[in-house]
Amino acid sequence: MIITGQQLVALSPLLILMSIAIVVMLFIAYNRNRYIVFLLTSFGFLSVFISLFIVKKIVPIHATTLFHIDKYSLLYIGIVIISSFLACIFSHYCSLTNYLYNFEEFYLLLLFCTIGCVSIIISNNLCTFFIGSELISLSSIGLISYTFFEKKALEASIKYMVLSGIMSTLLLFGIALIYSVSGSLEFSSIIYELTMITKSFHNAIILFFGVSLFIIACSFKLSLFPFHIWTPDVYQGMSSEALMIFSTSVKIAIFSVLFKIFIVLSYFHIEEVFYYLVSIISCLSMIFGNIMAINQTSIKRLMGYSSISQLGYLFIVLVISRNMQFSLEVTGIYLINYALSNIGMFGIMSVLSSLYKNFNVDSIFSYRSLFWSSPILSGVMTVVMLSLSGIPMTVGFLGKFYLMSLVVKEHMWLFICLFIISTIIGFCAYLKIISCLFVAPSDSYCHKNIIISSQNINNKFLIGLLTTISIFVLFLGIFPQITIHLVKYFWIQW
């Protein structure tokens, strides 16, 4: 197999990440230096982000039979890299300062997880997808159990390891069934063969079970109902910095592949076979996730259930992906909001956990009256929560508005009713956190449990970074044409 120069350039984001991972491993082996490893990792992420502007000049392009890079892929690689870069920054200045040893391995796990995400996004082969998903799973287990001195972290890592192993088996079995009837592992070749296969009832049944197992395994990775059982426990056991990449990059990567597959399926009207399966998963996820989030007193568990509902909203796009241009636009806008909001929320928790050792960052009650002692962090937290709930003047409203418009075009009235009901329920869950922030301080509670003084917040850089994220959330919501033009730029030549 001959690889051309253009193909190497197209694969440069993946090659840069792999090279940086090798260099970091060598530094860890010969000379442990947390600061140098942090700089190398940050340099790698920045280099990948810059390389995207070079790659966009030659896309779309097939880089061997394993990878296909287009503008759609570049958009989500950019989101993944930004999420990983911010997780790297917050981990350096926040959580890793509390660890006694093994600082450097966190960055290595972060790199491996990002490599898995990028390889999945540009994958054009079921083998590439499987290897990438396994790389994500293995590095995620390390990220979950990195705070091994905490009981919840070990419990969460064991749960995720066992369930992830089971789902990997189902995924591999589904891939085997698809290969048995299509004779190919390439996405493009499989879709071509499907047009002939569906005429045979026997092959169609095998194909249906194979694709169904594939969707179920991906639903587990996306923590959708009813494959969500691990989500709240794993979220509660992970550090805030690890959650930045686990809750954004991993899910964006998995969803991007599913979306590309269903877009191609829609050309042959094969996606109608899986209409009911995807619709049921979507509706149950958005209702269940929001209902369970209401009674949570743990913010991480609440964000876990929130992720179930947020991805549940977006999952319905898979069955109406035949309206390709609008579906791509909706997906891009919605995932940009999802990434910004989650990074902002876990960033706040990361800053507070590092600045105040006695601060229970996971309890909602710990944030009681936070506004009166730290108005900036409270403001950022409020903006993030409002964006997740889809309130106007935030980018979250833009995402849900476009999603609703897409559903209305398809006349899916039942989904519209469930969408509105679940959004109202979700807003009540987010409002509980917001109301805690602005409660008037009381001597009997506030001063005994948490005393936050503005002079203690000495790391202005992280506070400024969080403020910038919240400004972006508002700016993109007030001026939606910027977000729309950005997303259109990536799908216009998809």
From Swiss-Prot:
This is NADH-quinone oxidoreductase subunit N. NDH-1 shuttles electrons from NADH, via FMN and iron-sulfur (Fe-S) centers, to quinones in the respiratory chain. The immediate electron acceptor for the enzyme in this species is believed to be ubiquinone. Couples the redox reaction to proton translocation (for every two electrons transferred, four hydrogen ions are translocated across the cytoplasmic membrane), and thus conserves the redox energy in a proton gradient. The keyword NAD applies. It is a multi-pass membrane protein. It comes from Buchnera aphidicola subsp. Baizongia pistaciae (strain Bp). It is an enzyme of class 7 (translocase). Signal peptide: none annotated. It catalyses: a quinone + NADH + 5 H(+)(in) = a quinol + NAD(+) + 4 H(+)(out). GO terms for molecular function: NADH dehydrogenase (ubiquinone) activity; NADH:ubiquinone reductase (non-electrogenic) activity; quinone binding. The chain crosses the membrane at residues 8-28, 35-55, 74-94, 103-123, 129-149, 161-181, 205-225, 239-259, 273-295, 301-321, 332-352, 379-399, 414-434, 462-482. It is found in: Cell membrane. GO terms for biological process: ATP synthesis coupled electron transport. It comes from the Bacteria. Keywords: Cell membrane, Membrane, NAD, Quinone, Translocase, Transmembrane, Transmembrane helix, Transport, Ubiquinone. InterPro entries: NADH-Q_OxRdtase_suN/2, ND/Mrp_TM. NDH-1 is composed of 13 different subunits. Subunits NuoA, H, J, K, L, M, N constitute the membrane sector of the complex. Its EC number is 7.1.1.-. It holds the Pfam family Proton_antipo_M. Belongs to the complex I subunit 2 family. The keyword Amino-acid biosynthesis does not apply. HAMAP family: NDH1_NuoN_1. GO terms for cellular component: plasma membrane.
